[in-house]
């Protein structure tokens, strides 16, 4: 009888204490859920490119982004050239995300038969909440190789003369759900320059922005200002304006630009197109992504 009373007492004690323990667990769970979370800015731009320039976005880890970029001839070619549609230049590129912060890319352009490769690293990422960071900051380094046949093959030519390098610090902010602005101080180094009056190292200041119009439509613009006395007087600053159209796994970018080249060395230091003279090209970029490696849970 005494043992029975002992068991009953233990049972009553357990039933009385259990709700308190579970209530404490639930309270602790609620407190943990209420801890401030870090919210990172997403979709500052639809793709890793604004138009010609790199954007604040990187390709996701394990994702391969195939880009086809196309530029037609100048609109001032008139009806005989079908306002530029008879002529075209193209770049095909592959970008791959290695980590959340690092991506690499390669490409080949018909302009000067250029091969290019680059590395793009996200140093800081805009965030709010538990950890606040007002800006996204990215470092970009690229190399371009001109593979045209030598103009004067009989003289001594050096492989290094084919190379040019670009370094950029890209920083910007997504101010609202629809508006993003970024700046791109840039240095382009050319091993070979056309004349002794030009500089091997060219400094340019770029600015780009995006305004979202609808859920799947946005307008983009970018401009590069090359500081004076670095390149030939007949060269022009690059200005491009266009639209992003998102359709499932594809992003179409339709734009007008005074630049033919689609790598930094070309559209920053070798651009001859003039908006005032109608030397404007219609073009498009198409982006298609493929998941090569599934993200870890």
Put a short name on every predicted segment.
Residues 234:
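Positively charged, low-complexity, intrinsically disordered RNA-binding extensions
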Residues 24-156, 163-167, 172-183, 187-191, ...:
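Transmembrane beta-barrel domains of Gram-negative outer membranes and organellar outer membranes
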Residues 1-6:
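Positively charged n-region of N-terminal signal peptides that target proteins for export
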Residues 19-23:
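Sec/Tat signal peptide C-region and signal peptidase I cleavage site
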Residues 195-228:
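A contiguous binding-surface segment within folded domains or other stable secondary-structure elements
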């Amino acid at each position: 009888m005494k043992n029975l009373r002992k068991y009953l007492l233990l049972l009553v004690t357990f039933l009385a204490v259990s709700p308190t323990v579970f209530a404490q667990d639930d309270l602790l769970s609620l407190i943990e859920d209420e801890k401030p979370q870090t919210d990172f800015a997403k979709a500052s731009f639809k793709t890793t490119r604004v138009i010609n320039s790199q954007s604040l976005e990187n390709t996701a880890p394990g994702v391969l982004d195939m880009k086809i970029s196309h530029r037609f001839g100048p609109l001032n070619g008139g009806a005989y050239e079908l306002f530029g549609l008879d002529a075209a230049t193209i770049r095909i590129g592959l970008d791959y995300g290695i980590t959340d912060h690092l991506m690499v890319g390669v490409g080949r352009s018909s302009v000067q038969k250029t091969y290019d490769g680059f590395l793009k690293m996200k140093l800081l990422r805009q965030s709010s909440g538990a950890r606040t960071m007002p800006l996204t900051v990215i470092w970009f380094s690229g190399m371009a190789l001109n593979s045209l046949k030598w103009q004067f093959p009989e003289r001594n030519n050096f492989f290094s003369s084919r190379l040019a390098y670009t370094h950029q610090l890209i920083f910007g902010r997504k101010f609202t759900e629809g508006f993003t602005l970024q700046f791109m101080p840039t240095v382009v180094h050319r091993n070979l320059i056309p004349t002794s009056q030009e500089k091997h190292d060219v400094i340019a200041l770029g600015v780009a922005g995006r305004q979202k119009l609808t859920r799947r439509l946005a307008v983009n613009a970018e401009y590069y200002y090359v500081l004076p006395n670095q390149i030939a007087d007949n060269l022009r600053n690059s200005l491009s304006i266009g639209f992003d159209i998102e359709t499932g796994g594809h992003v179409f970018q339709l734009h007008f630009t005074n630049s033919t080249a689609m790598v930094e060395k070309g559209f920053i230091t070798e651009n001859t197109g003039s908006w005032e003279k109608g030397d404007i090209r219609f073009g498009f970029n198409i982006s298609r992504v493929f998941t090569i490696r599934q993200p870890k849970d």
